[in-house]
Amino acid sequence: MSLDTTEKQELINAHQTHATDTGSAEVQVAMLTERISKLSSHLQQNIHDFSSRQGLLKMIGRRKRLLGYVRGKSEKRYSDLIAKLGIRG
């Protein structure tokens, strides 16, 4: 479940820290969150798609590591990010 170019650009614009920021941890977490959301809805319809389930778990782990990095750098950035994305963190 990939994101198309316009969705990616919207996420980048919403979460970038400066004008040319396309790969900061905040942007990566936002993209992973969107991909996780799409894949979760796919798995609700296709419950026996085990390879996609494994990919989902890998994405969740990657997002968790990135959130840990952001939290280590700045608690305020972390709390702002999880509030903006609506995730538990």
From Swiss-Prot:
User: What's an example GO BP annotation here?
Assistant: translation
InterPro entries named among the record's database cross-references? Ribosomal_uS15 (IPR000589), Ribosomal_uS15_bac-type (IPR005290), uS15_NS1_RNA-bd_sf (IPR009068)
Q: What is the lineage of its organism?
A: Bacteria, Bacillati, Cyanobacteriota, Cyanophyceae, Synechococcales
Q: Does the keyword Ribosomal protein apply?
A: yes
Briefly, what is this protein's role? One of the primary rRNA binding proteins, it binds directly to 16S rRNA where it helps nucleate assembly of the platform of the 30S subunit by binding and bridging several RNA helices of the 16S rRNA.
The signal sequence is none
For this protein, the record's PROSITE patterns field holds: RIBOSOMAL_S15
Q: Which Pfam families match?
A: Ribosomal_S15
Q: Name one GO molecular function term.
A: rRNA binding
Entry-linked CDD domains: Ribosomal_S15p_S13e
- Description of how the protein assembles with itself and partners: Part of the 30S ribosomal subunit. Forms a bridge to the 50S subunit in the 70S ribosome, contacting the 23S rRNA.
Q: What PANTHER family does this protein's entry cite?
A: RIBOSOMAL PROTEIN S15, BACTERIAL AND ORGANELLAR (PTHR23321), SMALL RIBOSOMAL SUBUNIT PROTEIN US15M (PTHR23321:SF26)
Basic and acidic residues bias (residue ranges): 1-10
> What keywords does the record list, in alphabetical order?
Ribonucleoprotein, Ribosomal protein, RNA-binding, rRNA-binding
Locate the compositionally biased regions of type Polar residues: 14-23
List the protein's name. Answer: Small ribosomal subunit protein uS15
Single GO cellular component term: cytosolic small ribosomal subunit
Name the segments for region: Disordered: 1-23
> To which protein family does this belong?
Belongs to the universal ribosomal protein uS15 family.
